[in-house]
Curated annotation (Swiss-Prot):
Protein name, as recorded: Fibroblast growth factor receptor substrate 2
Residue numbers bearing the Phosphoserine modification: 177, 211, 221, 365
Disulfide-linked positions: none
Function description: Adapter protein that links activated FGR and NGF receptors to downstream signaling pathways. Plays an important role in the activation of MAP kinases and in the phosphorylation of PIK3R1, the regulatory subunit of phosphatidylinositol 3-kinase, in response to ligand-mediated activation of FGFR1. Modulates signaling via SHC1 by competing for a common binding site on NTRK1.
Phylogenetic lineage: Eukaryota, Metazoa, Chordata, Craniata, Vertebrata
Domain spans labelled IRS-type PTB: 13-115
GO CC terms of this entry: adherens junction; cell-cell junction; cytoplasm; cytosol; endomembrane system; membrane; plasma membrane
């Protein structure tokens, strides 16, 4: 064993050794850099070269590995002795080396999971991609830099003939030898999808796909050339997508809510123009004397939005949002003022919560205040006696039918609304009665004859006259005596030493 490590010659190691394999390190051009012996232990890969220095790769640091008929390659991580890189070795027993490494990884519960590098290929379809595990070192592939700064395919033209711990170019990307045909699963065409160990399931997912997203520029150009009028609808219905480009990944976002509103507004304006051209007599504009550009641009029928008016639901046409008027004006909407029309034309709010009304209550008399009782509004903000059908929110200029006014005025005349009544008045003191307990303090404190409290039946006078009973009597003589006693306490004249313990005067 020791002789093999010190003298790794071809003759010293048999060709059928269990865990030692004769390998030749090659570069990306297929040139041989040096021969050695690859040994697989329980924890790491060890490469012994002729100059007696060994290179170790721990199994936990291997990102992916693969094999060909006469080639074994793997990718190491940044924590390895050699750093990050892809290393390839020619070996006559490459398949045995791969199977043994995979068995060791499975026994040690080491899972190498790497997402495949998906690239576009114009010459070969997805169904022709072989499913054999292989490495990403395809011949002629352009070098790409990783986010951490290390090259994905290092160059080994200036590498020495033996591995070194300081140079990540100990191994090389897997490349075929001179004259070798690219017929093996590992030797695929340029820019081909690369699959590694434990990632064969990705190929099944890719085979199930039927189409590939086209770039955004192509889609927009085709949409403009074919159907320019249908472009807003296609943009509106488009979902966020992720497109894979040769230079990177492109994210295509869907339309924002503001864009959707603008596109819907354009649709409604177009629909209004069609209705005006079809039947112009029905959509008559009202003249209010205001020079409003918004009112002149599009018909007012397609812009009116009313929420919670009289609690009635407005019929809506198919394909249009709730609450929008698209048909001709009916008898109910003809009473609406134009000023309210101009305000609601610019405000298109939906799902607005209905606010409780605020009314100014008239001053109640004493009898009405007693008859109405306490004011307790209900949970929904309306009094029980009020009809919630009559709730006008954000419709200050809307004219309500006269029948509604009659009903509302009759209700307000019968029962004053009590919702949000800010008439805070002090209740009358005439009906109040104060019960108090009178205690005889002059009597003796004899336990045999306890004094029983007396509860008078007559109410207490509203204006008390004997206010002197509420004040305490001050004993002047006792106050002067306590003051003299306080002045007689010893004071510090500055001669005594003060410490932390006797710095304050202690009580006598």
């Amino acid at each position: 064993m020791g002789s093999c490590c010190s003298c790794p010659d071809k003759d010293t190691v048999p060709d059928n050794h269990r865990n030692k394999f004769k390998v030749i390190n090659v570069d990306d051009d297929g040139n041989e850099l040096g021969s050695g012996i690859m040994e697989l232990t329980d924890t790491e890969l060890i490469l012994y070269t002729r100059k007696r220095d060994s290179v170790k790769w721990h199994y936990l640091c291997l990102r992916r590995y693969g094999y060909d008929s006469n080639l074994f390659s793997f990718e190491s991580g940044r924590r390895c002795q050699t750093g990050q890189g892809i290393f390839a070795f020619k070996c006559a027993r490459a398949e045995e080396l791969f199977n043994m490494l995979q068995e060791i990884m499975q026994n040690n519960s080491i899972n190498v999971v790497e997402e495949p590098v998906v690239e576009r290929n114009n010459h070969q379809t997805e169904l022709e991609v072989p499913r054999t595990p292989r490495t990403p070192t395809t011949p002629g592939f352009a070098a790409q830099n990783l986010p951490n700064g290390y090259p994905r395919y290092p160059s080994f033209g200036d590498a020495s003939s033996h591995p070194s711990s300081r140079h990540p170019s100990v191994g090389s990307a897997r490349l075929p030898s001179v004259g070798e045909e690219s017929t093996h699963p590992l030797l695929v065409a340029e820019e081909q999808v690369h699959t590694y160990v434990n990632t064969t399931g990705v190929q099944e997912e890719r085979k199930n796909r039927t189409s590939v997203h086209v770039p955004l520029e192509a889609r927009v150009s085709n949409a403009e050339s074919s159907t320019p009028k249908e472009e807003p609808s296609s943009i509106e219905d488009r979902d966020p997508q992720i497109l894979l480009e040769p230079e990177g990944v492109k994210f295509v976002l869907g339309p924002t809510p503001v864009q959707k509103q603008l596109m819907e507004k354009e649709k409604l304006e177009q629909l209004g123009r069609d209705q005006v051209s079809g039947s112009g007599a029905n959509n008559t504009e009202w003249d209010t004397g205001y020079d409003s550009d918004e009112r002149r641009d599009a018909p007012s029928v397609n812009k009116l939005v009313y929420e919670n008016i009289n609690g009635l639901s407005i019929p809506s046409a198919s394909g249009v949002r709730r609450g929008r008027l698209t048909s001709t004006s009916t008898s109910d909407t003809q009473n609406i003022n134009n000023s309210a029309q101009r305000r609601t034309a610019l405000l298109n709010y939906e799902n607005l919560p209905s606010l409780p009304p605020v009314w100014e209550a008239r001053k109640l008399s004493r009898d009405e205040d007693d008859n109405l009782g306490p004011k307790t509004p209900s949970l929904n903000g309306y009094h029980n006696n009020l009809d919630p059908m009559h709730n006008y929110v954000n419709t200050e200029n809307v004219t309500v039918p006269a029948s509604a006014h009659k009903i509302e005025y009759s209700r307000r005349r019968d029962c004053t609304p009590t919702v949000f009544n800010f008439d805070i008045r002090r209740p009358s003191l005439e009906h109040r009665q104060l019960n108090y307990i009178q205690v005889d303090l002059e009597g003796g404190s004899d336990s045999d004859n306890p004094q029983t409290p007396k509860t008078p039946t007559t109410p207490l006078p509203q204006t008390p006259t004997r206010r002197t009973e509420l004040y305490a009597v001050i004993d002047i003589e006792r106050t002067a005596a306590m003051s003299n006693l306080q002045k007689a306490l010893p004071r510090d004249d500055g001669t005594s030493r003060k410490t932390r313990h006797n710095s304050t005067d202690l009580p006598m």
